[in-house]
Amino acid sequence: MKEEKKQLRSGFTTGTCAAAAAKAAAFFLTGDEKTQISLQTPGGRVAHFQVQKLVDGEMTWFGVQKDAGDDPDVTHGAWIYGAVSRISKDMGFRRSVESKSDRTCEKKETVEKHDVDQEAWTDGLARAYEWEPDTEADHSGQFRLFLTAKDGIGLVTKPGLSCPVGNYAINPVPRQMIFQSVTHVLEETEAHGDYLIQLWIPAGRELALKTFNPKLGIEGGISILGTTGIVNPMSEQALMDTIRLEIHMRAVAGEHSLILAPGNYGERFLAEHLGIAIDQAVTCSNFIADAIRWSADAGMSEILFVGHIGKLIKVAGGVKNTHSKYGDRRMEIMADCLPGTLDEQVRNEWTDRILGCNTTEEALEYLKSWGICDQVMHTAVSRMQRYMKQWAGGNCDVQVVTFSTVYGILGKTSDSDRMIERWRHS
């Protein structure tokens, strides 16, 4: 009897958890302490959370433990805390005002005086977002809300993200969720004045080291993310979005040349054998064709692609996504690169040998022993380059370097040395 495939369980984003924590804190400020919180996500699903109170000095926080479902999310199980306080003493702070007409986080910034609780306004809380609702229906106008963060939420240090440089990485949709959740509570009590919402993730700084944040220029913590409020398990789209965002950020920074590497092998090879710093490269995983296309669309004029032969040999066969779930034609493609001048009987015998190999490294041993490795690799990298240029739409120069962990550089296209030398000294 065929076993039914297990249905994977979805979870909630950091944005949804932060909104729930802030909502619980808002209730507490009104004198109503909750142990459970419900809210509707932008995707329409109603989320229910158990909340935990934590008293830290004179601050009272309410926490929600993130449940990412069956998604392999490093933030699964992390506690996300929120606090809401009345701003009551004069103290200047910088705020980033969210424009009604633009939710892309290109904000106008002003410096003003507001009443701020001295104990709540500690170092690291120097910037805050102020909510300006889209319509009067969103907010009665009797109070103002400001949103900032404590430890564990990263600070944006590079342009091109959906939050301005110098602000905490709290993305537009989560910000709106947080503001609306607190607004709904405060309006029930006819609140007046200014209120400060703070977020805190105790493990955020450590967790961030396991994410793309350091590479994206988000320092000191994780991001508060989400568009639908729901985490869909095993999402390829999330990884693709991250890769595309990093390429976009480099273009925004004025870069016109790019290094792409599928993964850790390529990055290590760049550093150890080519003398190029790891952080110079964008890791594109298995999304080879997509990364090339995104780079061309972003305006890159040059791409240096460096990857292990075990992955790039697939590209020589026109494979756009090198994940094994799309098939494994490595040996067939390798055999197809054998010299056309071979005697038919020899070619058939050598083809059978290659097709019987389990790894590309094993196949390379045969090619080396037959004295044709350089010829085969020249053919392979030429084909890789041809396909990559096609995927770029003919809009940029693509050079390729492929290597083996045993034999080092196996093949490279004609102008790759020039690009390597320039990157080495950049």
Predicted segment positions?
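Generic N-terminal targeting/processing segments that precede catalytic cores or assembly contacts
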Residues: 1-91, 121-210, 214
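Acidic/polar hotspots within intrinsically disordered regions
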Residues: 114-115, 123
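Cationic, low-complexity basic patches in intrinsically disordered or flexible, solvent-exposed regions
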Residues: 99, 114, 131-133
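Short, amphipathic C-terminal "tail helix"
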Residues: 396-425
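A structural signal for small-residue-enriched, beta-sheet-centric alpha/beta enzyme cores
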Residues: 9, 15, 222, 227-246, ...
